[in-house]
């Protein structure tokens, strides 16, 4: 299946989607503590904001994707998610940071489903194989976590944001790629 360029691109998309998801959920409290000097108890609420937005996005995605194709939504969602991620180092308050986090989660929450759905739509006769491949890509998302650790040690909080930007930028490029092939 990895010989099929479209399926390969979507598989890498799953890897970056999972990596960004895990990265954000782990990095949010650290970022709040290190950049904004928020105490540990309050910083622990950051992931709650992230997961509330992801939950809302999952429900909205079920409604939106019943009416609009994932190929049309994918680049728009990732573009807004990328912009919100890029804004993180520029905002000056914990509240503004959490607003950015909420927007990122809202926009990127359905990236896994979009990658998988688009790959299956492209090669429907290989649904089982694609599904197995995508599940394996979930494990690969752990590679991004390792990169986050390296980036944090080398560049601090900005390094974390840099790795997350790369993940979401790939997803944006993937969305544009999918839109052109739809």
Locate each region found by the language model.
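Intracellular juxtamembrane helix-capping segments at the cytosolic ends
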Residues: 109-124
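A membrane-interface helix-boundary motif in multi-pass transporters
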Residues: 147-169
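Helix-loop junctions at membrane interfaces in 12-TM secondary transporters
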Residues: 90-100
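Short hydrophobic/aromatic, small-residue-rich stretches within specific transmembrane helices
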Residues: 47-51, 134-135
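Multi-pass alpha-helical transporter architecture, strongest
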Residues: 162-182
